[in-house]
């Protein structure tokens, strides 16, 4: 079963938690959920595409990994995790102020906007998948892009990584799937800290799907917030700790 389901969804309330962290009554739930979708879509598409077009940057240049939305009493706290926070903030904070004003128009609550830097993008499944997608759109060989991503992740301290690409690879008439793995990726082990993401590359031959799994170690405690704390520790330290082997 571990190979069939989403690894993050399978570990919710074990060592992972949701990106939307709030509670609402039945009558307000639908409105708040739609508000979350609008906020995420605007940050990833509307606002960033405008900034990228203005500054002539690639669409995924901001390196946004995830957007966490929390709703304390009559407030809305939006936290953007990005590998390039300076690109989002802009010169003298001009871009982030414009983003804050636009998001305040979407939500009726008092808005707080935070930017968190991802210091090791090579260990973030979302950024790795989007990086491979951008390379495929630039006509880089899919094998070279896959191997480069795997080597960078292992060099930065990952205990295992797997990358899948599927579609008309290399312009072939018949679509196929190829994958590359190094190290361990124990999908059946619930205590395993596995990051997963999916991205799409729009090429001249059609869409190519990319999936990445990154194994960062094991979390022994039963705590939904354990993954977030571990992420912060890995960013501050030198990467994932490798298990000892007795010889």
From Swiss-Prot:
Keywords of this entry: Ribonucleoprotein, Ribosomal protein, RNA-binding, rRNA-binding
Region described as Disordered: 224-247
Transmembrane segments: none
Disulfide bonds: none
GO molecular function, one term: structural constituent of ribosome
Domain of life assignment: Bacteria
PROSITE patterns documented for this protein: KH_TYPE_2, RIBOSOMAL_S3
Gene Ontology annotations of biological process type: translation
KH type-2 domain location: 51-119
Start-end of Basic and acidic residues biased regions: 224-233
DNA repair listed as a keyword: no
Pfam (any one): Ribosomal_S3_C
GO CC annotation terms, alphabetical: cytosolic small ribosomal subunit
Keyword Metal-binding recorded: no
Assembly description: Part of the 30S ribosomal subunit. Forms a tight complex with proteins S10 and S14.
Job of this protein: Binds the lower part of the 30S subunit head. Binds mRNA in the 70S ribosome, positioning it for translation.
Family membership: Belongs to the universal ribosomal protein uS3 family.
Matches recorded under NCBIfam families: rpsC_bact (TIGR01009)
Name recorded for this polypeptide: Small ribosomal subunit protein uS3
């Amino acid at each position: 079963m571990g190979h069939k389901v989403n690894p993050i969804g399978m570990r919710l309330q074990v060592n992972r938690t949701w990106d939307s962290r709030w509670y609402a009554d039945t009558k307000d739930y639908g409105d708040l959920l739609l508000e979350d979708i609008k906020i995420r879509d605007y940050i990833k598409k509307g606002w960033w595409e405008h900034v990228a077009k203005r500054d002539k940057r690639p669409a995924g240049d901001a390196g946004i990994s995830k957007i966490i939305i929390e709703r304390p009493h009559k407030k809305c706290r939006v936290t953007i995790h990005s590998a390039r926070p300076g690109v989002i903030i802009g010169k003298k904070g001009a871009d982030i102020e414009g983003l804050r004003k636009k998001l305040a128009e979407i939500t009726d609550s008092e808005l707080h906007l935070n930017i968190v830097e991802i210091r090791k993008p090579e260990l973030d499944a979302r950024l790795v998948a989007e990086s491979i997608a951008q390379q495929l759109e630039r006509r880089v060989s899919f094998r070279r892009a896959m191997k480069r991503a795997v080597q960078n992740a292992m060099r930065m301290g990952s205990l295992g990584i797997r990358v899948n690409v599927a579609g008309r690879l290399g312009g072939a008439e018949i679509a196929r799937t190829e994958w590359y793995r190094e190290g361990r990726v124990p999908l059946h082990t619930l205590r395993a800290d596995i990051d997963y993401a999916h991205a799409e590359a729009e090429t001249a031959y059609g869409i190519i799907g990319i999936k990445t799994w990154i194994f960062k170690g094991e979390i022994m405690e039963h705590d939904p917030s354990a993954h977030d704390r571990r992420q912060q520790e890995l960013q501050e330290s030198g990467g994932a700790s490798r298990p000892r082997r007795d010889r």
